[in-house]
Amino acid sequence: MEASLNNMSETNGLNKESLSSLKGLLNQVFHLEDKDLRTYSPLTLAYIGDGVYELVIRTILVKKGNCPVNQLHRKASSLVKAGTQSSMMEVIEPMLTEEEHSVYRRGRNAHSPTMAKHATMADYRRATGFEALMGYLYLKDDFSRIIELVRAGIGEDQI
């Protein structure tokens, strides 16, 4: 992978420092520009945060060892559902910075046109806030903070 990134940076004139993160790589290859994160709607942040969190969970599960896909799916589904995300927020909320808490609140208070089938409205709103926070941290390029919060919220024994 590193060799192909080096080759890509040599042939396309890409900045090697920017290639060290997924977001930087996407920005360079697709000519994207960073936007002011405060301009994103909380539901847009939740949209990307949902995918980021799902990828983190799936990566952890796959890296723990090869097993049947249906087992991976069941375990991942239990960890990404609204009820679990809501419970995680109860654990990690005291850890949030003022800025992170503001993003979480905006996501939690956003009025979504949909609702999870198997969650209470309170759980769904807290989960939306959690996903908005994950999206915000991803777009801020703070993956280490995402991992820190996920680890604290889930705990290693649940995975």
Predicted regions mapped to residue ranges:
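Double-stranded RNA-binding/processing signature
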Residues: M1-I159
